[in-house]
């Protein structure tokens, strides 16, 4: 596991950089503090809790199998933090960003991401004013649950169709990113339906707005996730093989 430590300084520099340089309020994929009505904020939190519990159980088992998994879990969490802190301006006056959940999804499965994702979202809400505490459940459902689950299904399907590993990882990361934004669009569209056209029209409008910047971001995230996974596999082949 000593080889893994070479990644830590770069990850820490990224975390420190985004913590110090992005303290402003964000209007990105993360639904901002106070934006959702209380009943919806509570609803999404209640829906998210079972996934969080299952994720904690899964992580406990992984650590019981091998304590060195802690470092890989931390690396995946840091990868999520750094990528999801990269805010890219959008034509809407908002901004978009990668999610970073594909790496952990491929390595540990989607349940683990529910824990890593909510930890990242909590830190971003407290340190970067990115997202919020009251909207934590809604943001966690989109980025830490539904996105990773969609990505995982796509990854497994791609492997079953004999796609090579890199292509499968790329598709996982890309679809997890897009699924996150589509879920956020649904969450917002349900709460804020179009006065004239209704809920579905509102959802489609949010999706169209996000797609302008999110599709190229998702493609870039897929490529970066492949590079990161291959880098870890090259330095820790036995460890990665064990996780499979």
Curated annotation (Swiss-Prot):
Pathway: Cofactor biosynthesis; adenosylcobalamin biosynthesis
Broad class of the protein's primary localization: membrane
Single annotated GO MF: cobalt ion transmembrane transporter activity
Keyword Phosphoprotein found: no
Subcellular location: Cell membrane
GO biological process: cobalamin biosynthetic process
Transmembrane segments: 37-57, 71-91, 103-123, 135-155, 166-186, 206-226
Alphabetized InterPro entries for the sequence: CbiM, CbiM/NikMN
Keywords: Cell membrane, Cobalamin biosynthesis, Cobalt, Cobalt transport, Ion transport, Membrane, Signal, Transmembrane, Transmembrane helix, Transport
Origin superkingdom: Bacteria
Summary of subunit composition and partner proteins: Forms an energy-coupling factor (ECF) transporter complex composed of an ATP-binding protein (A component, CbiO), a transmembrane protein (T component, CbiQ) and 2 possible substrate-capture proteins (S components, CbiM and CbiN) of unknown stoichimetry.
Function per UniProt: Part of the energy-coupling factor (ECF) transporter complex CbiMNOQ involved in cobalt import.
Entries under NCBIfam families matching the protein: cbiM (TIGR00123), PRK08319.1 (NF006184)
Family: Belongs to the CbiM family.
Name listed for the protein in its UniProt record: Cobalt transport protein CbiM
Source organism: Listeria seeligeri serovar 1/2b (strain ATCC 35967 / DSM 20751 / CCM 3970 / CCUG 15530 / CIP 100100 / LMG 11386 / NCTC 11856 / SLCC 3954 / 1120)
Lineage: Bacteria, Bacillati, Bacillota, Bacilli, Bacillales
């Amino acid at each position: 596991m000593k080889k893994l430590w070479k990644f830590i300084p770069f990850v820490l520099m990224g975390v420190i950089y985004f913590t110090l340089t992005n303290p402003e309020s964000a209007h990105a994929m993360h639904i901002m503090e106070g934006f959702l009505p209380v009943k919806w904020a509570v609803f999404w939190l209640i829906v998210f809790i079972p996934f969080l519990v299952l994720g904690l159980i899964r992580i406990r088992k992984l650590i019981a199998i091998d304590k060195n998994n802690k470092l890989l879990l931390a690396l995946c969490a840091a990868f999520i933090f750094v990528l999801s802190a990269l805010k890219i301006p959008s034509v809407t006056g908002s901004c978009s960003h990668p999610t970073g959940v594909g790496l952990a999804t491929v390595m540990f499965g989607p349940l683990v991401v529910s824990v890593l994702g909510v930890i990242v979202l909590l830190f971003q809400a407290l340190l970067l004013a990115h997202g919020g505490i009251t909207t934590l459940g809604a943001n966690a459902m989109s980025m830490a649950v539904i996105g990773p689950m969609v990505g995982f299904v796509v990854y497994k399907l791609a492997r079953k169709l004999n796609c090579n590993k890199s292509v499968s990882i790329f598709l996982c990361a890309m679809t997890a990113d897009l699924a996150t934004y589509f879920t956020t669009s649904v969450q917002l569209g349900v709460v804020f339906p179009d006065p004239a056209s209704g809920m579905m029209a509102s959802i489609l409008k949010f999706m169209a707005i996000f797609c302008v910047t999110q599709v190229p971001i998702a493609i870039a995230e897929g490529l970066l996730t492949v590079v990161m996974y291959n880098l870890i596999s090259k330095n820790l082949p036995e460890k990665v093989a064990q996780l499979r």
